[in-house]
Amino acid sequence: MIYIVNPILVKNNYIISNLYLLLIQEIIYNLRYYILFLNNNINVKFNFIYYKIIILLTNININSIDTIQNINNLLKIILTLKLNFININKIIKFNILIFILPFIYNNIIILNGLYKTCIQLFKKNNKIFIIKFKNNNKNIIYVYIYISLGLRIIFKISKLNIDCYFNNFKFNFLILLLYLNNIYINKNISLFIYNNIINKKILIYNYIKFIYSKYNNINNIISLKLFIIKLNKFNNIYINLLNILFSIKLNFSYYSDFYINNIYNKKFYSIIDNLLIKSKKYLKIFKYQLLNINRNIYNNITLLLNNKKYINIILENININPLVQYSDQVNNLSEINQKFKINMITTGLNSKFILNNDLRELPRNILGYISLINTNEGLTCGLVNYLTTNIFLNLKYLFVIYYKHIFYNRYNFKLLLNIFNKNFYNISFNNIYLKKNINFNKTTILTINKNTFKICNITQNIIYIPFNYLLSFIENLIPFIHYNDSIRNLMSIKMHTQIVPIIYPNLSNIITNYNFILNKYLNHLIISYQEGIVIYVSCIKIIIRDLFNRQIIYYLNNYKKINQNILLIYKPIVWVGEKVNIGQILAINSNLLNSEYSLGNNLLVGYGSYLGYEYEDAIIISRKILYNNLYTSLHLNIYEISLNIINNIPEICSINLSKMYYKNIKHLDKYGIIKEGTYILANNILISKLMFMPFIFNNKSLINIINFLFGSKLRIFKNKPIISTIHDIGRVIKIEILPNHLYNKTEKNNIYLKFRIYIGIQKYLQLGDKICNRHGHKGIISYISEINDIPYLNNKIQPDIFISAISIPSRINIGQIFEGIYGLNSLYLNTRYIISNNLNKNYYNNYNHIFNYYKYNYNNNFNINSKMSYNYNKYYLKNPFTGNMINNSICLNNIYYYKLIHMIKDKFRYRFIGLYSELTQQPIKGNTKQGGQRFGEMEVWALEAFGASYLFKEFFTYKSDDIKSRKILKNYLFNNYKIKNTFISETFKLILKELQSLAINIEAFCIFNDTNNLLENLPINIIY
């Protein structure tokens, strides 16, 4: 544990982590203030001899033996008091536990052993808002006065009436004011109020201001309250209402004709604000208890010491708070992206259906603060967005961003503007270079001011923001993002959060500036905290000897469990004898390669048809990818087995199992535990667990004779081995044996020993897996071709994958064509390109066309020996079976591809005729219940591509809701009965209904011969 006298404010990469440190500082400040207040209070009959505030950081999970269950990092605030009570003439010293808060660092909070992420919220500010609209050709004004959290007053103003809604009650506020004015205030005020309502010149706030300013007499207000008490049974409502209205500050600023959900009327809100409200409330209770401690000293001291009630309320509030979400840890990018999530509206889940589309659209006034593209899918589309990369929070809880002056070489300073202040400037997204630039002769520039685009002259009032600042972190990783459809870019962002880290990644040939390590990455790396020399490096730890001759050990915990069960491996990048400085990176994880974000490989892509397997979204790959392990990923399964003591009889592990063959126990040691390094398959024994049962027999004399002969009590033992499943085909990489007293020192249970078996699983690329590129183009592997069966060029170059040619124009992601052209050029030149997303910002639109034309020509000249087409970047391939030239040419590109987490091994399973629902007669859902799998549109396309007509028949008949056909199939399989003709299923009837909706009528007729040997058609109703 660590004792902290004063928490030091260290700048963090995330907003909520910095606010958490400020929260601790404010709690300490309030505690000191209350102690000084009580010490100077006359009514207090005790003196403070000594006090001290201790901040205790405990339960640190560094170097912990428990690598599965992440221990909650707790921050405890303890107040040590030494009081001298005057009445009893005694000095009492006691320690009071004020708060227990989970420690928040880098927007990560560990609750119940799980990683969770804190997200942000845009919340309505405490102001006055006005909404105007027409109802039955009548103008109605709604005035919302937000006082505090959950407290608001609503006025509905029509032409001659004002209705007030407060505390679930509705009443006529105008009649109330007129009635009160007639009794206590001048009667001329009523005429003044009436005229102003008709003319619509002032609002209800002005009435209160007028009354309060003209008759600013406390006695009048008190008499007014006394009258309202006698008025009716709802007196408390009016008292609270007038108290609130009279206490409103006169310098309130409000905006007319603005919606409540306007971005100007919102402020930043997070879990820290909720903790601040709870902490202030509890500190006031603590102050009151300390103030009245002298009445009953011993009872009040016990109340102070036993304050678990308030601590548990705060901890429970954090657990159920919707701003604390389950962390997405598929890769580092998905975790970073979730930390920048922000909710734009504060409505509940039930009201997302009825929200207007205007609230979902991204207004222009938040350009640079909220990402242009990145948002959620589904019901929360446009309501949950993500912050940009370079955004900060000021002291007024408003987002600010840095702007440069357009002539920043002359005016070398930056402007820090919020969402409202930036409206006073003309903002340009393209920089101007004064020297050696074609823009030198330009006098006008495109800018945005007050949410409108306009062309204005170049003046000093223009500020500049790079276009990368308008995008989120993931969007800046996509090269040529301008040339893709925005919806396809959104899909690409979601795919980046589903990428699985692989064992052997390669650096991308086409990158952006955001591929390198940024500040946001430093939270996932191991960094040196002192200057020194490396004296030892291994895959387990790094030892550094610092300037004070101390050995500092950095452990690389490669078996740490994360939420998605992906094995995150740390690799040292320093060597023995190297001098390291403060802040230098010592080790990186498997998401990085050479200090760059890289999770995929460069593949040679052929856009064309190959045996029809590339139908729709299907992808054909070469077996060379499997031989080189280009997309092999590591996953970690952990078995946690405990040995219990049941009825004072312990469970044991032994290799002496009854009714077991040698092949089942050959990988076990003498204690019945599987050996490290063993490659296990499905249904292998991991631990042989024996449970002893008492022998129950009615003849006690026989039992006594047996016990006398064998010298021990007769018992029955039962085999309960732990067996691996089909998802555990891998290698045992680590085994831990933990006694109970090492990891569980507080709770008393029947567990006396615990085993942990770590199984490393290599998942290779196989049929059914999904791969994607950086432009939102994903597909399922439909065929793995042999190397000898793939078409080739004259220089023996073969494409790695084949994709349908119509997949690019149908998705409008032209950016992958540009990436493929430059990637192919970089492959020939053995170079890499750092691409700016906006290539035309300084050179007009012709720059990109000329550059592409040059790259096309270079690629053609490099492949001068290959058979080229008349079109650029298109090649003729040879048939691998005949060696002849294939008639049509195809396009070849070099594109960076990833592997997604949607792997067929985790989802695909075998199921025969299983359980069906009694109501719908459809297969039940759920893997644990052996339920049915969803057979969607893309699966139907795959069956159509393979021509699986018999499989279609099974889905429409035997595996559908046709009960009779299912029974016929069951009797055929189990009882060897003859299979009969199938009946008409409900699925087939539904297809007929769908065809009838398309004006396609399908009828059935029974054809037979009549008495005159003429054919007649008898219609048959096949639907009912």
Swiss-Prot record:
Keywords: Apicoplast, DNA-directed RNA polymerase, Nucleotidyltransferase, Plastid, Transcription, Transferase. It is found in: Plastid, Apicoplast. GO terms for molecular function: DNA binding; DNA-directed RNA polymerase activity; ribonucleoside binding. Its EC number is 2.7.7.6. It is an enzyme of class 2 (transferase). It catalyses: RNA(n) + a ribonucleoside 5'-triphosphate = RNA(n+1) + diphosphate. It comes from the Eukaryota. In plastids the minimal PEP RNA polymerase catalytic core is composed of four subunits: alpha, beta, beta', and beta''. When a (nuclear-encoded) sigma factor is associated with the core the holoenzyme is formed, which can initiate transcription (Potential). DNA-dependent RNA polymerase catalyzes the transcription of DNA into RNA using the four ribonucleoside triphosphates as substrates. This is DNA-directed RNA polymerase subunit beta. The gene is rpoB.
